């Protein structure tokens, strides 16, 4: 099975949601600044954008990185519409899109190599769901 297909990634969203701890999410949201810098390693379909909005994060900067160009193209084409259907105000531009006041940009490439470039002064949140099991953890921790 190819785990980098839009159909597979969308199908597993509900399973991923049920696997998340509400207590951990609430602790995260309590410590996240009002205008967070978020880096999503192995961003896939950029579902983190929808999750952030659903959790009340409507401002900040989101940067997603994925090695699979077709997945990033799919995310760019579909995530703004998904957010719009969920009631968000979405504005698209050539570089990405805004969901409410959350500026969203996606890049194709090696997530570990590009992670620090997104926010040279550091990110407030690094998301790496279903990613850290695919890379060397020590290499990942060295860049975050």
Indicate residue ranges for each PLM-predicted region:
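Class I SAM-dependent methyltransferase Rossmann-like catalytic core
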Residues: 1-31
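Conserved class I S-adenosyl-L-methionine
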Residues: 35-44
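Glycine-rich SAM-binding Motif I of class I
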Residues: 46-50
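Class I SAM-dependent methyltransferase SAM/SAH-binding core
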Residues: 52-113
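Short conserved loop adjoining the S-adenosyl-L-methionine
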Residues: 113-120
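A conserved beta-strand element that flanks and buttresses the S-adenosyl-L-methionine
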Residues: 127
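Hydrophobic adenine-recognition pocket in adenosine-nucleotide-binding enzymes
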Residues: 131
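A short, conserved alpha-helix within the catalytic core of class I
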Residues: 134-144
């Amino acid at each position: 099975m190819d785990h980098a297909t839009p159909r597979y990634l969308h199908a597993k969203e509900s399973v991923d949601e049920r696997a998340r701890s509400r207590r951990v999410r609430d602790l995260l949201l309590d410590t996240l600044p009002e205008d967070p810098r978020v880096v999503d390693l192995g961003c896939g379909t950029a579902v983190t954008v929808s999750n952030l909005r659903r959790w009340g994060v409507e401002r900040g900067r989101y940067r997603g990185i994925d090695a699979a160009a077709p997945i990033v193209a799919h995310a760019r084409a579909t995530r703004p519409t998904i957010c719009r259907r969920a009631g968000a105000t979405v504005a698209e531009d050539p570089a990405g899109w805004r969901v409410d006041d959350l500026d969203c940009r996606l890049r194709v490439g090696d997530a570990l190599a590009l992670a620090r470039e997104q926010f040279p002064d550091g990110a407030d949140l690094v998301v790496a769901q279903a990613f850290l099991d695919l890379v060397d953890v020590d290499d990942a921790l060295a860049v975050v």
